[in-house]
Each structure stands twice: as C-alpha cells, then as structure tokens.
Amino acid sequence: FPENEFPFSTATLSDPLTGRTGSLFRGDATDPLLIETNTSTEYWQKGASLLHTDPLGHQDVVLPDNSRVYMIAGTQHGGRAGAPSDPGPDINPRNPHNPMPAVRALLVALDEWVVSGTPPPPSRLPTLTGGTLVEPDKTGFPAVPGAAVVRTTNRVAPPGDWVHPKPPAESYRTLVCKVDDDGNEAAGIRLPDI
C-alpha cells in the first residue's frame, strides 16, 4: 500500500530501517483532533499495529493527547449490516460482523471533542504490554474443522524503486490481536455480536 511509509504514528518515533525520525503530526497548533478506526483487516493486511508500536514492533508507544486509535474487534474492512456470509470462491465464510455502530458512536465522540472539548474514550486496541498484540502465528486461534487459519500478515517495508522493484531487504514487524477461546479478538472495541 503506498500509504504504508514511515511515519506511521501520531507519536514521534525513529525508524531504524530508514534512519528517519517523524510523526504524522507536526507537533504544533495545526495538528487536528484525530480518531482513527481500524478493523481486523487493517491489522492483517496493512500493518495497523504500526500506528501504536515502534516500527520494529518491540514496544507500545504513547499517543499524543489529540490522537485516539480504536480497533473494532472481529470486523473486516468494508463490513456492513446485511453483508452476505456466503464464502463464494473462498474457503472460509465472509464475516457478517458490522463495525458501523462503533464508527457512528466514535463520529459522535469526535464531534463532541471538536465542538465542546469533551475528549473521547481512551484508545481501545491490542497492546504488547497487555499481551493482546502478538505475532500472526501466535494468535491462539482454536482448531475449527474445515477452516483455514491465516498465520502471516502482509509485509510492510520501506518503499523501494517503483519502476524496477526488488524485494525489500528489511521489513517492519506487524502484529495482530490475540484471540479468546472462541476465536474472537481479545482487545479493541468488542461489539455485542462478539
């Protein structure tokens, strides 16, 4: 993904792969109040853990006071009410879990934050400290007969030559949420369906 380039986080961090230091924010009065929501998809496919860990995924980072990050547990990118669960050509059924109730509530929270100064709830996300942010092969998915379990994430690496691309020599460590005994993500916003 072209947007997967350091800096990933609103916290100021140093990137050992590129030698750069930076943040998505400038650290001045122009920085917005920011709420970012992510589904499980963003953790597995786009490296969303890099929003709240150092680039090598060794420690949680403290986000600035004007930034919140929320993972909506057990949801997929583009999930919606009434989405079909028929697997189509895929092995596993599609996920019918709808993230929109949380997104709507957080939009109201953002409006209240901007208009009246009422801060939204603290970030809700998996963390290294809490033991809920793990390597993709350490999630703890229970065995489900006939179901394939993903054990790898998409690689996130510093961008190279877009004309004559070569495989990256190094990549960032992307992590995902640990699951509970039922196979549901153990952290983030767990909506009533979960």
Kindly label every feature range from the protein language model.
Residues 1-194:
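C-terminal His-loop and adjacent cap/lid subdomain of alpha/beta-hydrolase
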